[in-house]
A protein has these predicted regions:
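Acidic/aromatic-lined carbohydrate-recognition and catalytic surfaces
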Residues: 1-41, 56-92
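Conserved alpha/beta catalytic core and glycan-binding cleft of carbohydrate-active enzymes
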Residues: 55, 67-223
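Short, acidic/polar
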Residues: 38-52, 209-216
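Domain-wide signal for the mature, well-folded portions of proteins, strongly enriched
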Residues: 17, 32, 46, 50-51, ...
Length: 223
């Protein structure tokens, strides 16, 4: 934010943030939601704006968007794109790659990624000991599509955090005015023996071990 006494300029602050991240060798992927009522040209214009004006490295597209049109847009050829429904898009050979060479990008150039909850939910089920999950886990670990990469995660911005995952069997959003109706009920979590914050050392140790197991499974999925 702005220093005390200075006028706030969110646009300038965000651009400064992006520059600082890039200077540190980090990339920035923002999340944008479209509800399906926007025209394809409007959606493309929005993505172009963020890429050209703010120099973001990628966009996580949530909701409904014309993915096939977006992929073919030349102004977005170097933008990393994360989305859910790539299986519904006809991808031509090479569309998952950046228009720049490996040397120019200093990386593999892969830019399209599937961002779905399947890995997270199946791995959480396996983590808490649900039966019949071994085959699903093996499929996720071996999964490496030729066209679209897979982004695996054990928690994201929509739902339980990693600590919530080992601390609660059910969501508890009673105090936010939504009467606990907001958020998904399907979190595949396990509280390790007691709901919410505890002081029992055995439960705390088990939760810590489960967190380590979760991060280990995530790491293995990328090897």
């Amino acid at each position: 934010g702005a220093a005390p006494g200075q006028k706030k300029d969110p646009v300038k602050e965000f651009k400064t943030l992006v520059k600082a991240l890039h200077k540190a060798g980090l990339e920035l992927v923002i999340e944008l939601y479209f509800d399906g009522t926007q025209s394809p040209s409007y959606v493309v214009d929005v993505l172009r704006f963020w890429a050209a004006e703010y120099h973001v490295d990628g966009i996580h597209i949530v909701g409904y968007a014309p993915l096939e049109t977006i992929v073919k847009d030349p102004y977005l050829a170097d933008l990393k794109l994360w989305a859910k429904n790539w299986d519904e898009v006809r991808l031509e050979k090479g569309t998952d790659r950046s228009s720049r060479s490996k040397e120019e990008k200093k990386g593999p150039g892969r830019r399209l990624s599937a961002y779905e909850t399947g890995f997270m939910l199946d791995m959480r089920s396996f983590l808490k000991g649900d039966e019949g999950m071994l085959n699903q886990v093996a499929l996720h670990v071996k999964d490496n599509p030729d066209t679209v990469a897979s982004i695996n995660y054990m928690a994201n911005t929509n739902g339980f955090t990693l600590l919530d995952m080992v601390s609660y069997d059910h969501k508890h959003n009673e105090d936010n005015g939504e009467e606990n109706h907001d958020g998904t009920d399907y979190n595949q979590s396990w509280n390790c023996g007691a709901e919410g914050p505890v002081r029992k050392k055995k439960i705390l140790a088990l939760r810590k071990r489960q967190l380590k197991n979760a991060l280990t499974m995530l790491s293995v999925s990328y090897t």
